[in-house]
């Protein structure tokens, strides 16, 4: 049994390291887009309005209304990185949304706070949803912050999501979650 565990861990580590080598970090893309893309300077009320529209649209995730409502938030040319995917064209983002929409249900998104600095709104949110994968449905819950810049038409031209996929997704996936938790157990000290 120990040999099997060792082989499993070694294989998983090798695959993980290989994936890390072939997938570039998004940090340089974020830095470049953040400097290049200029939104409008925001007020407190505009930041709150951005958060309210964002949460309202994503509360329809998993319903027929979602793709249209979410699509209306975004400009044709944009930078969006949600930690798992990156897009620069609205059409590609909408296609991604269509796929997401087929896998989730019972979505609840709450706006915790909205603040801003110059042209960036920082939207702090909580999202809970049921996620279908491999024929099973799992309830997920995560917190995150989205940095959002908008243009004069109030469309999102820049969005960088900061959230913890380990807690919000990886640990909850069938098969993968168990292996992830075994290799990197959650540590809690009170």
Each model region followed by its residue ranges:
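C-terminal motif of bacterial Sec signal peptides marking the signal peptidase cleavage site
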Residues: 15-19
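A beta-strand edge to alpha-helix "cap/lid" segment located at domain peripheries
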Residues: 21-39, 102-108, 112-190
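General structural signal for alpha-helix termini and helix-helix connectors
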Residues: 60, 79-80, 132
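Hydrophobic alpha-helical core bundles mediating ligand binding, dimerization, or RNAP-core interactions
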Residues: 51-58, 74, 97, 127, ...
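Short, low-complexity N-terminal intrinsically disordered segments enriched in polar/charged residues
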Residues: 20-68, 72, 190
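A solvent-exposed, acidic/Ser-Thr-rich amphipathic alpha-helical stretch
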Residues: 67-72, 76-118
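Bacterial N-terminal signal peptides that target proteins for export
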Residues: 1-8
């Amino acid at each position: 049994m120990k040999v099997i565990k060792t082989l499993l861990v070694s294989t998983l580590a090798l695959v993980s390291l290989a994936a890390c080598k072939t997938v570039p970090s998004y940090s340089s893309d974020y830095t470049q887009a953040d400097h290049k893309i200029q939104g409008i300077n925001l007020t407190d009320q505009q930041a709150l309005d951005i958060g309210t529209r964002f949460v309202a649209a994503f509360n329809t995730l998993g319903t027929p209304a979602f793709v249209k409502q979410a699509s209306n938030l975004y400009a044709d040319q944009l930078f969006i990185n949600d930690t798992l995917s990156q897009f620069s064209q609205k059409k590609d983002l909408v296609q991604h949304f269509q796929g997401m929409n087929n896998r989730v249900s019972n979505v609840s998104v709450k706006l915790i706070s909205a603040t801003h600095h110059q042209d960036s709104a920082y939207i702090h949110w909580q999202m809970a949803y049921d996620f279908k994968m491999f024929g099973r449905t799992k309830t997920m819950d995560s917190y995150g912050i989205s940095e959002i810049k908008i243009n004069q038409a109030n469309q999102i031209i820049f969005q960088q999501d900061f959230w913890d996929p380990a807690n919000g997704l990886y640990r909850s996936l069938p098969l993968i979650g168990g292996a992830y938790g075994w290799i990197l157990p959650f540590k809690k000290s009170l």
